[in-house]
């Protein structure tokens, strides 16, 4: 915790092609070793693959995928009287999108397709169709929160 008060949130610029801040955040999340150009090329190629295979606007498919990935609830460990309880809490809007992007990139990297472009494209298409590993992660998170509903009164 800094002494000078809370740190201001840095705002990202929208990407040049789709004019979307969410796409910029996905590019940043995919970026490895500061290679933004490579990350952009991978994502735009993935969007081209989505457009070819679905025949729809890739931005619409991506937004639908993000809606299906972003969690509403999560559990947070809370220590009460020597015991740790998993307390379900609602997820803030900024954290929802951060978790959604993180899960999307992580599970795209774990896929078996040959190139990252295809992995990202297939993960986004799967998420838009409510299938895929990133959607399963969201469902598991919701199940954990539902299973621990009894401890919801420990919310702070």
Curated annotation (Swiss-Prot):
GO biological process: ribosomal small subunit assembly; translation
InterPro entries reported for this sequence: Ribosomal_uS7, Ribosomal_uS7_bac/org-type, Ribosomal_uS7_CS, Ribosomal_uS7_dom, Ribosomal_uS7_dom_sf
The keyword tRNA processing is annotated on this UniProt entry: no
Entries under Pfam families matching the protein: Ribosomal_S7
Gene Ontology cellular component terms for the protein in this record: cytosolic small ribosomal subunit; ribosome
Family classification: Belongs to the universal ribosomal protein uS7 family.
Quaternary organization: Part of the 30S ribosomal subunit. Contacts proteins S9 and S11.
Protein name: Small ribosomal subunit protein uS7
Protein's organism: Listeria monocytogenes serovar 1/2a (strain ATCC BAA-679 / EGD-e)
Gene name tied to this protein: rpsG
């Amino acid at each position: 915790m800094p002494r000078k008060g809370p740190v201001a949130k840095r705002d990202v610029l929208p990407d040049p092609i789709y004019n979307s801040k969410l796409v910029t955040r996905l590019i940043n999340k995919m970026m490895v070793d500061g290679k933004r150009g490579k990350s952009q090329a991978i994502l735009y190629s993935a969007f081209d693959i989505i457009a070819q295979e679905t025949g729809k606007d890739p931005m619409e498919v991506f937004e639908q995928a993000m809606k299906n990935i972003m969690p509403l609830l999560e559990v947070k460990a809370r220590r009460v009287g020597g015991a740790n309880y998993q307390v379900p809490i609602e997820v803030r809007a900024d954290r929802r999108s951060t978790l959604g992007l993180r899960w999307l990139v992580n599970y795209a990297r774990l896929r078996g397709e040959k190139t990252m472009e295809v992995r990202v494209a297939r993960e986004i298409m799967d998420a838009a169709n409510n299938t895929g590993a990133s959607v399963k992660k969201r469902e598991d998170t919701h199940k954990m929160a539902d299973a621990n509903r009894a401890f919801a009164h420990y919310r702070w």
